[in-house]
């Protein structure tokens, strides 16, 4: 089982161009560069191609759409190019984008749940690969079984990955339900449904010096910048991978403690955007 992986620097924010092959109305591709799940890009049909370019080479080892309406049979193909825009550095071929089905919150139809990002619905498409330094990226998505009849995504994450030498010693996932419970004057219990999101903390123990330095570089960045965390990347248990993959912000500062003989420990906690 691979160790956890983190993308802490989203290269989409530095892209010179971000273009979608088709766009429905005003739901523009530029929304993919926003760190929100309420602003989406929507294609006109069940396939779309995203093309990104950069002025300088970007290290890339992951492409993810953490909030999308793709079905379990949707495919994603990622191609990375050199500076001339024609030399292929990496080609994933067409593979399943998010084989674990989207969760279906109570009260939603299957089609509605596919894009119920604020209530625990939606899917997370991802592709992990050996890092390349690319000037251009092309992402092809095909989802002929899409329940809504079009491809939709709220965020695009592209960047280098970091994985510690030793995996997390402990982790959990919390479902944060903002429903408010109250009582009426007649004594009845009332519920005002709220949004739902997740929080995933991970404990890292016995980090060697190289991991300590890399982790410290990461947390020196403001908590304003979201990170993509996958505790069980490419795991055979697809639901486990889905449930412990999260795109969000650090909820608190991370102390790095010296343990013994050059080994360090810390805790990282991410709450979904």
PLM features per residue range, with description:
Residues 1-48, 55-273:
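Extracellular/virion structural assembly segments
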């Amino acid at each position: 089982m691979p160790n956890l992986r983190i993308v802490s620097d989203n290269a989409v924010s530095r892209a010179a161009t971000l273009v979608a092959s088709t766009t429905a109305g005003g739901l523009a591709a530029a929304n993919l560069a926003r760190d929100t799940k309420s602003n989406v890009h929507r294609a006109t049909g069940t396939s779309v191609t995203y093309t990104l370019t950069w002025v300088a080479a970007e290290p890339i080892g992951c492409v993810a759409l953490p909030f999308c309406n793709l079905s379990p049979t949707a495919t994603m193909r990622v191609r990375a190019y050199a500076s001339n825009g024609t030399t292929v550095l990496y080609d994933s071929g067409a593979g399943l984008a998010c084989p674990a089905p989207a969760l279906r919150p109570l009260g939603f139809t299957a089609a509605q749940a596919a894009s119920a990002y604020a209530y625990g619905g939606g899917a997370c498409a991802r592709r992990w690969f050996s890092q390349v330094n690319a000037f251009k990226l092309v992402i092809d998505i095909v989802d002929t079984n899409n329940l809504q009849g079009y491809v939709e995504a709220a965020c695009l994450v592209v960047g280098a990955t970091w994985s510690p030498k030793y995996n997390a010693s402990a982790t959990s996932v919390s479902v944060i339900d903002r429903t408010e419970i109250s009582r009426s004057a007649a004594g009845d219990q009332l519920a005002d449904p709220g949004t739902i999101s997740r929080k995933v903390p991970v404990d890292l123990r016995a980090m060697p010096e190289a991991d300590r330095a890399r982790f410290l570089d990461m947390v020196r960045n403001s908590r304003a910048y979201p990170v993509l965390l996958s505790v069980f990347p490419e795991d055979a248990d697809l639901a486990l991978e889905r449930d412990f993959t999260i795109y969000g912000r650090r909820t608190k500062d991370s102390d790095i403690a010296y343990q013994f003989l050059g080994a360090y420990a810390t805790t990282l906690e991410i709450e979904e955007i």
